């Protein structure tokens, strides 16, 4: 199995690349979805979150977590955010490992898995699982304009961007960088070129040449 960790800042086009690779036959795993999955009713992660942030977050009848209330408490300050991540991340990482070691990817042809990683620095201990780290790169100013075009408030964009790994960090940890400073057709061409080059190499590990 050829595993790609796909990263990029907010409004960089990361999800567009993930969808494009999925259309070409890659098995797609979105870590945002995994972060929601580990907080399903009855999970150990929910128990730990409730112990840290308040039992009143959990519905006593359904066991469902009030995610909105959790967000308000956990993202109120950096210390609370770090506490939530310290609880969630081990569960997310274990779930990812189980999925990568399972048979899901083997049902695709070629046997390629793309893992959409919102915060690459939080997954740094697991970069050894990736054959390639593919980073979608786009200037902050361009991303800000794109986010505005989708209806996002500028202050909200800047707040979210500040919480993410820096562009310098992403470039430093990238095996390959996809430039997305142009339009959709430019990005599509770069994705096609990347896919074709990996097919030609028979999906050999890019990091080791």
How should these model regions be labeled?
Residues 28, 130-135, 177-178:
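Short, well-ordered beta-strand core segments
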Residues 20, 24, 46-50, 93, ...:
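An amphipathic alpha-helix signature
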């Amino acid at each position: 199995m050829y595993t790609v960790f796909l990263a990029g800042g907010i409004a960089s086009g990361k999800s567009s690349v993930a969808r494009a690779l999925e259309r070409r036959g890659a098995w797609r795993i979105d870590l945002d979805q995994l972060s929601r999955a580990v907080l399903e009713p009855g999970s150990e992660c929910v128990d730990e979150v409730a112990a840290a942030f308040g039992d009143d977050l959990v519905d006593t009848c359904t066991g469902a977590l009030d995610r909105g209330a959790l967000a308000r408490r956990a993202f109120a300050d950096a210390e609370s955010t770090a506490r939530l991540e310290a609880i969630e991340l081990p569960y997310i990482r274990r779930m990812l490992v189980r999925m990568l070691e399972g048979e899901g990817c083997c049902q695709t042809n070629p046997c390629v898995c793309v893992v959409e990683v919102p915060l690459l620095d939080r997954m740094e201990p697991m970069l050894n699982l990736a054959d390639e780290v593919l980073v979608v790169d786009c200037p902050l100013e361009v991303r800000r304009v794109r986010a505005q075009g989708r209806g996002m408030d500028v202050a909200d964009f800047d707040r979210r961007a500040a919480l993410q790994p820096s562009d310098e960090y992403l470039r430093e940890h990238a095996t390959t960088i996809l430039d997305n400073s142009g339009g959709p057709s430019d990005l599509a061409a770069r994705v096609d070129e990347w896919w074709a080059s990996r097919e030609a190499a028979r999906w050999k590990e890019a990091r080791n040449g």
